[in-house]
């Protein structure tokens, strides 16, 4: 869809497309991880912080992906601030999930968060 968009943009579309994809993938993975944490019967109380961060990260990633898709007359400072918030949410969520890496869903989620964080960093660098 980015290639079909008539707005020329001023950022590498491959870097942009990767970031959009990673944001939506991370949002889905974090939502699924939160749900999986809720199924850990004897550990739900201990996983409250992880669940909360998963859901916060999912919402922020979803919003970031939607902001990035809109190309026409984008506001660079707003977009950069959103990317910064997303990379921070991903870093925080990954750190928490890594504490529970013995649970496969948390390990997978941490990896998705790190990929999204890296994609946000790459796009921020391309926007400078």
Regions found by a protein language model. Name each.
Residues 1-128:
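Amphipathic alpha-helical hairpins
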């Amino acid at each position: 869809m980015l290639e079909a968009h008539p707005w020329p943009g001023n950022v590498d579309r491959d870097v942009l497309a990767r970031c959009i994809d990673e944001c939506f993938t991370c949002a889905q993975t974090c939502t699924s991880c939160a749900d999986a944490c809720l199924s850990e019967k004897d550990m739900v109380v201990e996983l409250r912080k992880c669940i909360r961060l998963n859901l916060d990260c999912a919402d922020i990633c979803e919003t970031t992906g939607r902001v990035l898709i809109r190309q026409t007359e984008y506001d660079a400072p707003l977009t950069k601030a959103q990317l910064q918030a997303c990379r921070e949410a991903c870093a925080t969520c990954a750190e928490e999930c890594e504490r529970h890496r013995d649970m496969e869903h948390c390990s997978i989620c941490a990896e998705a968060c790190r990929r999204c964080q890296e994609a946000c960093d790459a796009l921020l660098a391309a926007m400078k």
